[in-house]
Amino acid sequence: MHREDLIFSDDRIGIVAPIYGHEVPAMVREFLEKATFQTPYFYMILTYGNRHGGAAELAQELCARCGIPVRYINLVHMVDNWLPVFDMEEEQLAVIQTDVAQKVAWIAPVTEADRAAHQAFLAGMRLAPPDAWQHLLRVTQDCIGCGICQQVCPSASIRLVEDRAEHVPGRCQTCLACAHACPRKAVQLTVPEKNPSARYRNPHVTLRELIQANQQPGCAGPAETEGGRV
């Protein structure tokens, strides 16, 4: 997503992304608007926690606006990432992998209840300040300046200032990667949390792999925690 050359060509090209407020994150939307996909089979896999609110239909509409013919959109239900557990339907993933391999044309169905949920969400958001989500994070005195938060942030919205993490509003996607990866749980929310101690790291992806995949300009190399390996 950080490449200057955004022309991609392959037999199959897919986007796997979470949904925030029933839609793909802003940076994913911007990527789709700028990129060119030269493929006969473009697909999207969207992950969600509480409810999807018609995410497949919204993603299909986004692709149409971007001039991207999308052949397949499916949803993967995960437990909300506020909780320190991981729940993914392995059987559903197997079906998705088979569908994509066979180039199945299918868009996940959307109900009127899904659409109503999204409209209710939008109505609630209109009551909040436009930049409310940009001020969701704070850094406590527990910060040890390891730099992990800076390296896992996909939008360069957190940085080290005098060996202490500092959140930078403006481009924050509120993915909470910084909060979940902090070894001291020093990245907290500015609003009450159901469980302030609940943090989750995918056991199938090492922190080093996450950092290397992210590769933010200006970030240092993979950090070392007290335990040594990240």
Mark where each language-model region is.
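Short Fe-S-cluster ligation motifs
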Residues: 171, 175-191, 205-222
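Fold-independent oxyanion-binding glycine-rich loops
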Residues: 17, 156, 170
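A charged, amphipathic alpha-helical module
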Residues: 114-146, 156-161
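FMN-binding flavodoxin-like domain, especially the glycine-rich phosphate-binding loop
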Residues: 1-132, 195-197, 204, 208-230
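Short secondary-structure boundary/hinge segments and terminal tails
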Residues: 81, 161, 190, 199-200
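Iron-sulfur cluster-binding cysteine motifs and their immediate structural context
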Residues: 138-139, 144, 148-167, 177-194
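Charged, low-complexity surface patches
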Residues: 52, 142, 171
